[in-house]
Each structure stands twice: as C-alpha cells, then as structure tokens.
Amino acid sequence: MSDQVKSLSQWHTERREQMRSSSETPQDPYIHIQPDEDGNSRFYIRQPVWRPASMAHSMAQTARYRGNADEFYSVAEHSVLVAALMREVVGGDPYEGILHDAAESILPDVSAPFKQLLPDLRYEEKLLDTSIRQHFKLPEHKTTECATADWLALFIEAAQIMPERGSDFVDPYNLRQKALKLREQEGWAIKCLPWREAKALWLDAFEYFGHV
C-alpha cells in the first residue's frame, strides 16, 4: 500500500473517531432531501428522522445496479419485489422487505465488491440500517427470510435486465435455479417502472404491509 493511500486511510479512521465522539449539534452535518408533508427538507446524519414520503422519492429515483441494467430499474421497485416474495414465497414479514434497502434513500446503491474496499461506507450504512430498524420496529438484523427473498429478487432481475443475464453472479445459497423457475413458470418479473410510478407503488406497499 502506498504512503498516500495509507495516509488517506489514516485520515478516514481519525475522522470517523472524531465523528463518534463529536460534540457537534444535530444541525451538523446534514444533507438535503425531498421535503415531506411538513416541509422538512434536511436529513441530519447523526440524528436521522425517517420520513416515508421522502424515502420513497429518493429510492424511486435511485437506480439499482448503479444504472448498468438494460433499463432504468429503481431501488423502490426492487424493495416491493422483495416484500412480495416474502409474502408469497419465502415467508417472514414483508414490511422488512419494503424497508430492507431504505438506507439507499440516503446512500447510493454500491456494489458488494466495492463495499469490501470501503469500510467507512459499510460502517455508515450499518448505522443507517440500525436506525431504520429501530424506528420502524424491525428485527435487529436482516432475517434469513428477507435475505433469501433479496437473493431471489437479484436473480429474477438479472435474468431480465442485466448483461450476461446474471450468469456470472455468485450463488452462495443455491437460489439461482429457484429464482429462474419462479420467473419462467410462475410469472415473477419486473416492470422497470418510471420513477413516479415506482414511488407510488412503494408508498402503497409501505402502507399495506405496515398494517397487515
């Protein structure tokens, strides 16, 4: 590792420790989000408040697969697919499925190989996910059912919109064939909805699964 990379890594480590012990007020730092029904347009990173309408707006405009699919496909539509798979195929609480990627309303959808190289990003993502799970009263950690539905969704999506149709994707839980069967024999597919439709779909599913 070069001295420059070491220096940058050390800076990130020191900055993270500073943030953990910081006496900064909740007003710092923040990012702008789409205003909610009360007009709130700031998301305080160390004092997060989760507003479904703002989350839906962001996830509906966030491209899954970093925009490398054949068509635009949103994190919002993916989340609805995971929730539906939990309800109809896997089991578990679909409400968790709707919210399993909600941290991506604040952070980008970063591929797993890059996440392995970015420990600070993984740390921040974990903080956001923990906050979401506490706020919406979800299990402390991602459940087996949600993880299974997420993998099934990955292979269903890839077969439809990804280069090489996902044939090169790792399959640690041997779920590829089950996903392809769901797609080919039971009609599970994605629509690649425009973002406004994906936003409305996510909000409808959020309301429905939150009250079932």
Task: Identify the function of each model-found stretch.
Residues 2-212:
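Metal-dependent phosphohydrolase cores
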